[in-house]
Amino acid sequence: MTSVLLLRLAGPLQSWGALARFDRRDTLNRPTKSGVSGLIAAALGLDRTDDLGALTDLRFAVRADRPGIAVRDFHIVGSGTYPLRPRDLITDHRRAEKAAAALDTSTGPVFGHLAARSVTKWYGAPKEVAPDPKTGVLLAGNTTRDAMMTTRWYLADAAFVAAVEHPDQDLLYRISDAVEHPKRLLWLGRKSCPPSGTISGGVHPGTAETILTTTALLPNATSPQPWAWIEATPGTPGAAQRTDQPVTYHPEGRTHTARWETRTRVSPEPTIGWDIIP
C-alpha cells in the first residue's frame, strides 16, 4: 500500500523552468517533478552531487488550485558606467592607478559615487579575472562588455497542491518534517522565489489520484474543478511525455529522463482539510 505527502506550493512568485538559457527563462504553468524533487532534496540537506536514492522513486502529481498570472521580467545587464566599489580596486591594479587621482582629490563620499568617466572604459563587474603572468597581480581580462538582454517568466500569486506518493511511509514523514524544518533554503523553481507559509499538508494513505480528490481546495482557489497532472505508466491512454524525471543535480552533469503524465479535471469532495499559516 502506498501513502501520499501533500505539499502546498504558494508564494508571491514561482518559476518552473521549461527552457533555461541565460537570455530567456520560461516557466511551465505548474510545478515540475524535477523542481519539487529539488525542493525536497534541499530540505533534506542533500548536496547537488549526492545520490538521490529513493527520491527518484517518488510518484508525482500536482493540482492547480490557483494557476496565477504569467508575468515577464525584462532585464538589461551591463554596458554604461557604474559606480566605483572597493573590490574594483583589488581586481585590477591598472584601473586602480587610473582612479587614484580622483580618489586623492575627492572630499566627499567616493565609493558608490565616483563614476566611470575618470577611468576609461570602466565596467563595474570585471570578468576573466586571473593573475598577471609577469607580476602575479590579479587582472581583469575583460573590462568592457556589450549590454545583455534577458527575459524571465514567472507565475504571480499562484498556489498548487503537489502530491508525492511512495510505499515507504517513514520516508514521507521525514520529508514532511524536513520541508517545515529545512536544512537548506527552499524555493519555488528559482532562488528568487521563496515559498510562503506552511508547506506540508501531512501524510495520508492512498494514491495520488484519490488524495487529490479528497483534499480540500486551497483558499482563494479559482475553480471548483481545478486541473491536475498525474504521473502515469508509459502507454497510458492520453498520457503525454515530460522530460523532468531527475537523475542527478550534479552541477557538471545535471540529468533528467522522460516520464509520462495525464491531465484531468478533479472535483474535490474533501475529507482532508488544511491547517496552514498563509
For every predicted segment, state its role.
Residues 1, 54-56, 154-156:
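Solvent-exposed loop and beta-edge segments used for protein-protein assembly and interaction
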Residues 1-21:
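N-terminal, Lys/Arg- and Ser/Thr-rich interaction peptides
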Residues 2-7, 24-29, 117-130:
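Generic detector of short, locally flexible boundary/turn motifs and exposed helical patches
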Residues 5, 60, 160:
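Residue-level detector of short, conserved catalytic/binding motifs and their immediate flanks
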Residues 12-13, 31-36, 132-137:
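N-terminal start-of-chain detector that recognizes signal peptides
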Residues 65-278:
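Internal, well-folded beta-alpha domain core
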